[in-house]
Amino acid sequence: MPADLSGTWTLLSSDNFEGYMLALGIDFATRKIAKLLKPQKVIEQNGDSFTIHTNSSLRNYFVKFKVGEEFDEDNRGLDNRKCKSLVIWDNDRLTCIQKGEKKNRGWTHWIEGDKLHLEMFCEGQVCKQTFQRA
């Protein structure tokens, strides 16, 4: 059975965020500021329909999708690229594959204990983040 990721989550830790941002081609100044942020993630889940808000003092990002249905994703607020995205359940992990200008790009969310985990990957760089309920 798929996990329930619903809730408001605050960043606890982040590993290799700069390497991931470099792979995305994000400029130096933005990378330095982004590393200092503690974003809050708000996930609304209704079955296989999701709305995810990632909010910080620098930028906010919003995505809405249904598991198993490819959609056009506009990454304005992140790296300003557009891609085709497909989100699937991989057991209790929610995994997104993003096809576009950058190769091997996507992310995976899952819950372990009382923590939300996120792995973001792009062109060989992997960023691992851990969130706790707000």
UniProtKB/Swiss-Prot annotation:
One of its GO terms (molecular function) is retinol binding. One of its GO terms (biological process) is fatty acid transport. Transmembrane segments: none annotated. InterPro entries: Calycin (IPR012674), Fatty_acid-bd (IPR000463), ILBP (IPR031259), Lipocln_cytosolic_FA-bd_dom (IPR000566). It comes from the Eukaryota. It is found in: Cytoplasm. Keywords: Cytoplasm, Retinol-binding, Transport, Vitamin A. Its main location: cytoplasm. GO terms for cellular component: cytosol; nucleus. Expressed primarily in kidney, heart and transverse colon. Detected in adult lymph node, appendix, ascending colon, and in fetal heart and spleen. Intracellular transport of retinol. Belongs to the calycin superfamily. Fatty-acid binding protein (FABP) family. This is Retinoid-binding protein 7. It comes from Homo sapiens (Human).
